[in-house]
Amino acid sequence: MNIDGKPHPHSFYRDGEETRVIESVTRENEGVSIRSKIEKLLVLKSTGSAFHGFHRDEYTKLPETWDRILSTEIEAGWQWKMFKNAEEVKSVDFNGAWKAARDITMKVFAEDNSASVQATMYKMCDLILKAVPDIEAVDYALPNKHYFEIGTLQKLGSCESKSLTAS
């Protein structure tokens, strides 16, 4: 993963499945509604991610940690302001906005060392809204792809065997 033109030392993305999506609806007397998305952006950082300070109860299984591997498949979406007509739509730099949203997403993912993914998503949304004034709302999904140390699954009650086979 390149951040500010340089390879990041511990953040990576998988090239190939990332998809750029647009949804557009035009209604007479209402205008043009456009939603843009980035889907299937698979990223991983090997350090610089924490998960602590959360509510704990009898259902809590994962321990707090101040440094962990974070891997996720990012889905980011943004809703544009309502456009009055096709001429307004043509005047917008959609490519520039997509690049700004993607660059912000990658940079914050790689560099932010927050206590949770939720805090990181908030920062991403805030920066995109500031960078592209024609965007009204931003949303993210960053589901965790967990990587456990050997033995952790047994502690969580997820497996019976004490051996692991890698393939």
Put a short name on every predicted segment.
Residues 1-99, 103, 107-167:
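N-terminal intrinsically disordered, cationic/polar leader segments
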